[in-house]
Structures are given as C-alpha cells and as structure tokens.
C-alpha cells in the first residue's frame, strides 16, 4: 500500500497512449488546463536536455517525433509538475547518451521518491537504492516478490550466490536420494 503521505503522483508510461500521439507539442504542453506546469522548471529542464523551448508551441504532432524525443518531452512535462511520487516505466528506452546521463543524475539527486521499472542494468546499478524484484516461479504459475534494501550490484551478487547455493543443495539432495534408492 502506498503511504498516505504522498499526495501528488506522476507517471511516465512505457509507451504514450495513442490518443496523446495525435496532439501537437503545443496542445501536449499547454492544452490540458488541469495540469499545472512550473514554467521555470519546464524551461530549465528543456535547456538542460538541449530541447529547443521554441518547439513547445509547435504544431508538430507527437506521433512524428522519434522515440527518444517523445520520451524527452514526456519527461519535460512530468518533471515540471508538482509531484511527491514519480513512477517511471522503462525510462531509459530510446534515450540518447546525454539524456540518459542527465536522467541518472536527476534520479540520483532528487529528494523525492521515484519508483521505476527497468531492465537496463546500467541504469539500475547507477541509480537504484532499493530493489523490488517481481518474478514468476514454479513454471511461471506463482508470483514471488522480493524486497531488498540494497543497491543493484549488491542485490545481483546476493541473488547469484543464492542461486548457486540452491543448485548445490539440489545436487546434494539428488545424490542423497540416488544413494537411498540404490540400497
């Protein structure tokens, strides 16, 4: 359960919803009157991400943007809102190296809570401070959740050691079973 101390959530989906792809950049940034943007942040982040702020009022559709540009404009908008808790779904997909480095730096330094899903081991090792590992076990029939207060490198090492021990234990059990059956 999410703590009640979080009042404002922001979410960056892995893919932009189809209805939003039809929007112009102008409509995406300024068309939704319910979204309160901090324009100082918006223009500062645009400069940091080397995004030409003149394009904010462009009629260019989101569908015409490259994957990296699309992710960048979503980051610009979301990070310019007032959020307590940020959810990111595969935030490093399609990003160029400069933007990825910027994102890692932002995530390392933000005082706010960010939860992200990623298969990018580099991003995980540079940024993650707590791991929530979701997996399907027993022939993908049973869900298991592991929560560890470790960075990714230590979690990965711990997982490998646990796996090696499980293999060793299974081998020992099999040998003991075979000995018992041979009698």
Question: Which sequence ranges carry the predicted segments?
Answer:
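Flexible nucleotide-interacting loop at or near the entrance of a catalytic core
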Residues: 163-183
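ABC ATP-binding cassette signature C-motif
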Residues: 1-166
């Amino acid at each position: 359960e999410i703590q009640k101390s979080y009042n404002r959530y922001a979410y960056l989906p892995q893919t932009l919803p189809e209805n939003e792809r039809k929007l112009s950049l102008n409509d995406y940034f300024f068309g939704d009157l319910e979204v309160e943007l901090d324009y100082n942040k918006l223009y500062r982040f645009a400069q940091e991400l080397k995004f030409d702020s003149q394009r904010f009022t462009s009629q260019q559709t989101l569908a015409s943007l490259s994957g990296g540009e699309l992710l960048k404009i979503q980051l610009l908008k979301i990070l310019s809102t007032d959020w307590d808790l940020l959810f990111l779904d595969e935030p490093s997909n399609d990003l160029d190296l400069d933007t990825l480095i910027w994102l890692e730096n932002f995530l390392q330094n933000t005082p706010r809570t960010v939860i992200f899903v990623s298969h990018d081991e580099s991003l995980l090792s540079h940024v993650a401070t707590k791991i929530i590992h979701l997996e399907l076990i027993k022939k993908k029939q049973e869900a298991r959740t592991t929560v560890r207060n470790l960075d990714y490198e230590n979690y990965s090492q711990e997982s490998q050691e646990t796996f090696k021990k499980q293999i060793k234990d299974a081998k020992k059990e099999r040998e003991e079973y075979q000995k018992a059956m041979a009698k």
